[in-house]
Amino acid sequence: IYGEVTTVMNRKICGYITWGKKLYWTDIFTAGKIGNPYMRYRDIMGDNVRFSDGRRDTPPEHEFSCRFGNIRSIRVIGDRRIELGVKGGNVTELERGRSLAIGNWITVELRDGKTESVVWDHISEIVFSAAPDTIPEPKDHPIAGIVETPYGMYKGLVQWDLDENSLDALLDGRMESSGISVAFKNIGSIKSLGNSSLVTLHSGRELYMWGENDVNATNRGIAINLPSVGQVIVGWHDFKLFRSIPLDQLNLPVYDDFAAPVRLFGRVETRNGRLLEGVLVYDLDEAMDFELLDGQNGNISYRIPFKYLRKIEPKNYKYTWVKLSGEIELVLGTMCDVTAANDGVLVFRAGGEVVYVRWRDVKRIELWTKVKQND
């Protein structure tokens, strides 16, 4: 992540930005949404609609999530509030919510390799951009690898234990009666042994490690950012093996690869056979193609930008089938985006008609690419 930080003293600090554990354009920024602009269509929804939190009048609070590569600027307007600008010019006011992204200090790696921390109260604005060709690469590099599960393999940037995300980060554990820490740059593979791990170094040396959450069943999960899918988080129960790979084996997007977001557009087919085409608002929440659909399959969680989704079909109260570009198919559950807790879909049809479809009445949703929208 690269950008220019303007402080309240009008200093401009340019460099690579570390935001908590977020380092890369594919990492996810999360904050709380303020209000819901789609409640103005409450009369269209009808008085018999009960939202997923059990209240009649207002839907539950939703989170805003997108990848850092979609963000143009962030302006600090309060200790827990920001104005976030996305590519294309739209600006949204957001609050801290359950996320810790708002209100914390950030670190900037300068051109000379030194780092400078900036506390939240001293930040005026952050403007993101591609790093100039003249600036050296950052000192640290991401963990690139393949994660194997019983259901398949995931190849991308890895965040271990939802914490360690760079080659200089340390994998902690115990061997025999003493503690040991190994930098990820020295690790070739990590194999789960249930409540311990077999760690193989690039040198060929094998380490049997146990006793810390990096290497046992208390691990919080292994996140993999896949360039054209989104983020996958594998729970320890489903984790089998991690293998490190060279970074150049990944086709990583750069800042300019993230296009300006567009409205969701497609067709909703209802269970009584009605076809409704137009601009969509999904779960009375997500309205742009850079926002994320959340769901789980067993111990594996998915966060998928809507721009990669092509079809969404609710199968029952608990599960939804989705199809991504690239012919990937998944069955997802647990999260309100893909269960009976979904608050329904608004369809803005040509001519100004607005139609609300309850989730229980949705048979299929087809989402179209920008090319299709312009046809």
Residue ranges with predicted function:
Residues I1-D375:
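Compositionally biased alpha-helical segments
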